[in-house]
Regions:
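Solvent-exposed coil/turn segments that connect beta secondary-structure elements
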Residues: 1-4, 42-43, 52-54, 61-64, ...
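Extracytoplasmic small-molecule ligand-binding "clamshell" domains
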Residues: 1-61, 69, 152-153
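Short, solvent-exposed loop/turn elements at domain surfaces
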Residues: 4-10, 66, 92-94, 138-139
């Protein structure tokens, strides 16, 4: 993708860099092959693989059942929990949702469901900017539909700019 630092991004010279690039280069070296890096908009990343435009995807992609129906995954190589980001001066900046530091949606019991309910109440009427075709968009549609106004973006950098400009309450 080239737009998801620190995992992958284009530097000022237009070259890909980041943790996934380093990881991929090391894998190519160990396999004794030359790898060519290409960028692809996120919402087309799986379709382009299926069309044979490249051989593998190395991207901050969560392994979901829906995606597993289309492509094969290796063992995950990195984990990064999802979270909301808001401006420091936002009323949302100091939320304490059910006293929980994190909520595991894969094992959402009563306490997790209560936390999601509190989050929905706190975010009611807010605008949340999110990259399209992501698990984050799926979360908003599943858990916060009707409570928040969702604005979709092609790249993380774009929604971050809108957060900084005050055009959304959270990303």
């Amino acid at each position: 993708e080239g737009a998801y630092p620190p995992w992958n991004n284009l530097n000022s010279a237009g070259e890909l860099e980041g943790a996934e690039i380093d990881f991929g280069n090391e894998a190519c070296k160990r396999m004794g092959v030359t790898c060519e890096w290409v960028t692809q908009d996120w919402d087309g990343i799986i379709p382009a693989l299926l069309q044979g435009k490249y051989d593998i995807i190395i991207a901050g992609m969560s392994i979901t059942e829906e995606r597993k129906e289309k492509v094969n995954f290796t063992t995950g190589y990195m984990t990064d929990g999802a979270r909301f980001a808001v401006l420091k001066n936002s009323g949302l900046a100091n939320l304490n949702i059910a006293g929980m530091a994190k909520v595991n949606l894969n094992n959402a019991g009563g306490k997790e469901q209560a936390a999601i309910g509190q989050l929905i109440a706190a975010m009611d009427g807010k605008t949340v900017c999110v990259q399209s075709s992501t698990i984050h968009q799926n979360f908003l549609e599943k858990h916060m539909s009707g409570a928040v106004d969702v604005k979709l973006y092609q790249a993380v950098d774009d929604h971050n700019l809108d957060l900084a400009a005050g055009r959304c309450d959270a990303v």
